[in-house]
Design a protein with these regions (language model features):
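Small-residue-biased structural context
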Residues: 2-134
């Protein structure tokens, strides 16, 4: 449960590193944004505040994916790059759907939302990103 959360929801771990400092810093910032969302949920912030934090996460993720794909394009065959881009596109589609459902009042942001964000990010960084960038 998030009530009274006093530690970050997600902490950067050395094994998250993909060996490219610029990308690692971007991943750290994404983790920071997820932690900001977790703190806002835990502290009972308004829907407006939650929407603003989620908007920031979506915007940054979109920018990060484009930047990361530039690095990957230099290393991977086109079909592997397209596969990686498809993972990014699927994530963004899911998060945009969550964002829209939240904005219309159809859902609340909760621990299940955070679990999805954390799980996807962790498995993507430790799997696809490491494979593509190392």
């Amino acid at each position: 449960m998030l009530v009274g959360m006093s530690t970050p929801y997600i902490e950067w771990q050395p094994n998250f590193s993909v060996g490219i400092e610029k990308i690692d810093k971007q991943h750290q910032h994404l983790i920071s944004l997820i932690n900001q969302l977790a703190a806002a949920i835990a502290n009972g912030h308004s829907r407006e505040t939650l929407a603003r934090v989620l908007d920031g996460l979506v915007d940054y993720a979109r920018w990060h994916f484009l930047d990361e794909e530039k690095h990957i394009a230099e290393k991977l065959e086109p079909d592997l790059l397209h596969s990686h881009q498809a993972e990014h596109d699927q994530y963004l589609a899911t998060v945009l759907s969550l964002q829209q459902d939240f904005e219309t009042g159809a859902i609340d942001l909760d621990e299940q939302t955070l679990t999805f964000l954390f799980h996807w990010m962790g498995t993507h960084i430790l799997g696809s990103d490491k494979h593509a960038l190392l």
